[in-house]
A protein has these predicted regions:
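Binuclear metal-dependent phosphoesterase catalytic core
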Residues: 237-349
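Active-site-proximal beta-strand elements of phosphoester/diester hydrolases
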Residues: 23-40, 150-160, 188-190, 245-252, ...
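Residue-level marker for buried hydrophobic side chains located in beta-strands
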Residues: 26-28, 70-72, 107, 189, ...
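Extended active-site neighborhood of metal-dependent phosphoesterases/phosphodiesterases
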Residues: 3-18, 45, 81-186, 207, ...
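N-terminal active-site segment of His-dependent metallophosphoesterases
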Residues: 1-84
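Histidine-centered catalytic micro-motifs
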Residues: 34, 189-195, 229-237
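Active-site glycine-centered loops adjacent to acidic/histidine catalytic or metal-binding residues
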Residues: 31, 74-75, 110-111, 192, ...
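Short acidic, glycine-rich surface-loop motifs adjacent to enzyme active sites
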Residues: 77, 182-199
Length: 350
């Protein structure tokens, strides 16, 4: 058996079977931020005008792959509910594009879709009953359960947490009951906001779930041994390990949050719009589910665009990097010039 056949079966290069057979693959995309028109945009940043074309490329790229389902982690569209005319137009653009997906799509509400998490200093309006009604009218349930073989995927509305709305208690009771019902199965959680991105006791900020809801959610991860958590919102890739749960923060398909460019020692070029158009940081995840684990593959899109009406280029070959989980002989290493683990403070507004 050759190396490529080993990888397809979830084997490492020695022929062992730490993961077992591959069961299926899902795609996780996030922060697509579709605008109300092909080039119309209510953002002051030029790169945001490309969101629709970049999403169209992602849809066609997904259609080339063998995937079982697609989960969008929120901020489907860019106009917020406070501007209902633009919101509705962006919804129409989103639905037109995803109607071409071959795999079924499931959506998580983001702060642009249903209102920001409860706080007094958010740049947009917070979640409320009217915004919830708008979401359910256009996209369906705020939270849901998806069963695939012995895996259970829970999609939640993170903006409800700490809101005090009646739906918060309903979601809380639903999630606790559903997790109890899923005992013995492999559990995955999908949320727009991450519980945290630096450490579990970090201060409240724009990009995490506030207390006391954060501790409640983390407690559920621990209690039910959730295999993996996937979140968006920060438009940058992060990986954390919370007890036994792998926590992934996904990149955006549309643009990068320029405030996080301050983490790096080299300033963005003018073409990168202060880091907002840093092309190698754009993409999505393929989550390969095996019998005894999962492997996340980051697909970089490099901001590729597909204008409306153009035919997709299906001649470009699909290539994948072999993941270390699939290669027990991965022994290559090198000394870092700069510490990747250092903690860097960034300005809160970019």
């Amino acid at each position: 058996m050759n190396r490529s056949e080993n990888a397809a079966l979830g084997l490492d290069s020695s022929g062992d079977q730490p993961l077992g057979a591959k069961l299926f693959t899902l795609a996780a995309i996030s922060d697509t931020h579709l605008n109300q028109g092909e080039v119309e945009c209510n953002s002051p940043f030029p790169v945001n005008q490309l969101a629709n074309q970049r999403m169209r490329y992602v849809v066609q790229d997904l259609n080339r792959r063998d995937i079982n389902l697609v989960i969008n982690l929120g901020d489907l569209i860019h106009p917020v509910p406070a501007v209902p005319k633009l919101y509705s137009a962006a919804v129409a653009c989103f639905k037109e594009q995803v109607s071409e997906l071959k795999a079924p799509l499931f959506c998580v509400p983001g702060n642009h879709d249903i209102g920001d998490k409860p706080n007094d200093w958010a740049p947009a309006g917070g979640i409320c009953e009217a915004y919830i009604d708008l979401w359910t009218e256009h996209f369906g349930p705020q939270y849901q359960r998806i069963d695939r073989q012995e895996c259970v995927f829970f999609l939640i509305n993170a903006q409800l947490i700490n809101s005090g709305l009646k739906d918060e208690l309903e979601q809380k009771q639903w999630l606790e009951a559903q997790l109890q019902d899923a005992i013995g199965k492999r559990i995955f959680l999908f949320s727009h906001y991450p519980p945290y991105f630096s450490h579990a006791l970090e201060d409240d900020n724009y990009d995490n779930i506030s207390e006391p809801g954060r501790s409640w959610l983390l407690g559920l991860l621990d209690q039910h041994r959730v295999e993996a958590l996937f979140a968006g919102h920060v438009h940058n890739f992060w990986f954390n390990k919370h007890e036994q749960t792998d926590c992934y923060l996904l990149p955006s398909t549309a643009f990068v949050r320029q405030d996080y460019s301050e983490m790096f020692r080299i300033a963005p070029t003018p073409e990168q719009e202060h880091g907002r158009n840093d092309l190698p940081k754009l993409g999505y995840f393929l989550v390969h589910i095996y019998e005894h684990g999962h492997v996340c593959e980051l697909v970089r899109t490099y901001g590729q665009c597909q204008p409306k009406g153009d035919l997709p280029d299906i001649t470009v070959p699909i290539s994948s990097v072999i993941h270390p989980k699939l290669n027990s002989r991965c022994r290559f290493g090198f000394d870092m010039r700069h510490n990747w683990m250092e903690v860097v403070e960034i300005p809160p507004t970019g």
